[in-house]
């Protein structure tokens, strides 16, 4: 099973400012030695070895993850603005010829999880087939409403690909061919669902938009079947611990330390910090990752091989 991140921000898309780009250039030039910039080849090598936060960015698109199963199924989780770039890549293959098929699971319909759908090119191509899955019984109505003429010039019905909607039950498995999928309601204003994908003996769990606090971690056993035996856990860490527990409590998001507590409790093999606040710079995200790793090192219950990463656009995992 292969997992690729196309959108990693929460709330709304964001771009780098001119000042941020200038600071990255200044940082790179300050680090560089004469030999690093003596030729185009040496420059490219130098840039390739710079930290991501200097040579690039974690990304500003909202949530979208591509999952490719071992049997070739394509599962798209959430359709924030990141799905636009995914769609452009898909158009270079079968989807550009009207021969593509994919499954889309939507965790909920807050805008940062659906705002890329009107611009998802494969949906415009006749012959392509899309199956939409969600525990939300009125998902189709919600998606169609996003594209009424007062909001968008092209209606959802005008997108010529085949579109079928399936309502799945929370806390129960459903199947896409040989893939087992389990959804679970998450604590979030307006409602949200996490998704657990089992492909053979590999398990991927995605929990975007969920608010757990210290007390919830002590009383989380309702989530045992959802979080157990996870190879890769993607978790909402939009806020710092102070924001999650004080400044923005009840806004619907968690912190890295809470994510780590849950990942360690359920012995997840790898944790990915996700759904970044749009106001956070790359430097801020670096600090969050550094603090998270320090927290892991101080956690006596964390296994030696437990790893934590921070999501960025283009990040891939092979399970």
Residue locations for each model-derived region?
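Active-site flanking residues adjacent to catalytic metal/cofactor-binding acidic residues
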Residues: 77, 107, 207-208, 235-237, ...
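Binuclear metal-dependent hydrolase catalytic cores
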Residues: 1-205, 215, 224, 282-319
């Amino acid at each position: 099973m292969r997992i690729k991140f196309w959108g990693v921000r929460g709330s709304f898309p964001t771009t780098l400012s001119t000042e941020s780009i200038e600071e990255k250039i200044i940082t790179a030039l300050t680090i560089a030695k004469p030999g690093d910039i003596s030729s185009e080849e040496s420059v490219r090598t130098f840039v390739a070895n710079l930290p991501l936060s200097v040579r690039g960015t974690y990304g500003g698109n909202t949530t979208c993850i591509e999952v490719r199963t071992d049997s070739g199924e394509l599962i798209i989780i959430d359709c924030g603005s990141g799905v636009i770039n995914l769609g452009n890549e898909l158009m270079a293959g079968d989807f550009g010829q009207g021969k593509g098929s994919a499954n889309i699971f939507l965790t909920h319909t807050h805008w940062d999880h659906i705002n890329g759908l009107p611009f998802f090119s494969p949906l415009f191509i006749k012959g392509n087939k899309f199956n939409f899955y969600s525990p939300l019984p009125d998902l189709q109505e919600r998606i169609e409403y996003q594209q009424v003429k007062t909001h968008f010039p092209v209606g959802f019905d005008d997108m010529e690909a085949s579109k079928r909607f399936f309502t799945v039950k929370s806390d129960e498995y459903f199947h896409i061919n040989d893939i087992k999928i389990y959804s679970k309601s998450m604590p979030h204003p307006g409602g949200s669902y996490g998704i657990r994908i089992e492909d053979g003996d590999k398990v991927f769990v995605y929990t975007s938009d969920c608010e757990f606090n210290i007390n919830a971690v002590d009383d989380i056993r309702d989530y045992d079947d959802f979080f157990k035996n996870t190879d890769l856990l993607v978790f909402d860490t939009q806020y710092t611990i102070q924001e999650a527990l004080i400044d923005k409590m009840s806004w619907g998001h968690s912190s890295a330390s809470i994510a780590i507590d849950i990942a360690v409790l359920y012995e997840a093999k790898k944790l990915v910090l996700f759904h970044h606040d749009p106001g956070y710079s790359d430097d801020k995200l670096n600090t969050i990752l550094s603090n998270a790793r320090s927290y892991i090192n101080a956690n006596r219950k964390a296994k030696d091989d437990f790893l934590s990463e921070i999501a960025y656009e283009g990040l891939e995992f092979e399970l």
